[in-house]
Amino acid sequence: MSQAFRTLALLGKANNDDVNQTINALYKFLREQNYNVLTETRLAHQLPCPAEHCMDIVELGKNADLAIVVGGDGHMLGAARVLARYDVPVIGVNRGNLGFLTDLSPHDFEVSLQQVLSGDYQTEHRFLLETTIYRHGEPKSSNTALNEAVLHPGKIAHMIEYSVYIDDSFVFSQRADGMIVSTPTGSTAYALSAGGPILMPQLDVMTLVPMFPHTLSCRPIVIDAHRQVKLVISPDNPDEQLHVSCDGHVTLSVHPGDEIIIRRAPHQLTLLHPKDYDYFNVLRTKLGWSNQLF
């Protein structure tokens, strides 16, 4: 048996009827089991929760043994980027679309969740990416991503000219609509849509997936996750703002001549799954792969 939990954090998208229904059911279930339940402040109005048990996500990270996130992968990504800094394990209840990161069904979560809370679960560690923008050699902005960091144009799609370095080794220069640098977790997200490979979550690698490159010879590259990726933006690009998006949530501004450093973050996400979790079953279900023929 693994660690059991007593103080639980409930997180979810506020003002969403489906999410609200599930959060209320979770809160009732957990309190009936005598768990200590903390919630996000923005959810406090819909739960009979004491004021001292309602707090922001940073305080939840400092006080909870386990976080239960209700929503889709997008909400899970937002919570994970913060909670990973506090080494708080996370499990998800799916109220989104695909739900690669949210295992529990909102309709019958009780048995699986009780097993997890009792210490009967699988543990998986997912690393994050740390992205920093340098301008004239000085750091200007930074953020983290669980799925991917994406270099892309602003409001109007156009080609970007940039060079790629792995550590200090020049790899190639390219004109493309952008570049996706993905973790294994993100290999079933944006990188998959751009033609990148599906990577098992346990692999310690990053994937570089160019977006619509203006060449026939360009292919995705898989590299050791302990390497550093540097994207150098050509000063010959049009003098307009480019962006790096972290998980599609946080946007960092990039100018011609800037350098983008992407490396493995110092912290990681601890993701919990029910005991019967199977990664390839998830892929088959979410991606609509055919069933076994014989």
From Swiss-Prot:
A GO-annotated cellular component: cytoplasm
According to its UniProt entry, the function of this protein is described as: Involved in the regulation of the intracellular balance of NAD and NADP, and is a key enzyme in the biosynthesis of NADP. Catalyzes specifically the phosphorylation on 2'-hydroxyl of the adenosine moiety of NAD to yield NADP.
Q: What is this protein called?
A: NAD kinase
Q: What processes does the entry annotate via GO biological process terms?
A: NAD metabolic process; NADP biosynthetic process
Catalytic class of the enzyme:
transferase
Q: Which PANTHER family match?
A: NAD KINASE
Q: Please state where this protein is localized.
A: Cytoplasm
- Sorted UniProt keywords: ATP-binding, Cytoplasm, Kinase, NAD, NADP, Nucleotide-binding, Transferase
